[in-house]
Amino acid sequence: MKLLLRNSKPKIRIKYRKLGKEKAWGIAHSDGLIEIDPSVKSKKHLEIVIHEVLHILFPEASEAEIENKSITLTKILWAEHYRRIEPEVHQPLQDGTK
């Protein structure tokens, strides 16, 4: 599965590949590519997606800042019962995009 966020700068793309050799759950690249290990599931998946997106949106932020913000956002969204469900019903976002 590939996810494209078009209104972000740079365009953020998420791809899944095994990251065992890198000893990472996720990697953010400066060109907007995020790689996530497909073994990451559930709440940890949410945390890693948020964490890597924050790295791209705020490249000047320290690892500690990114970690703190991603954990906070994950806890809030999880408490609000955000869950990844496939297939997804596409309802437009506030800007009209899917």
Residue ranges with predicted function:
Residues 1-44, 59-98:
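Metalloprotease/metallohydrolase-associated module, dominated by Zn2+-dependent proteases
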Residues 47-56:
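Active-site recognition of the HExxH zinc-binding catalytic motif
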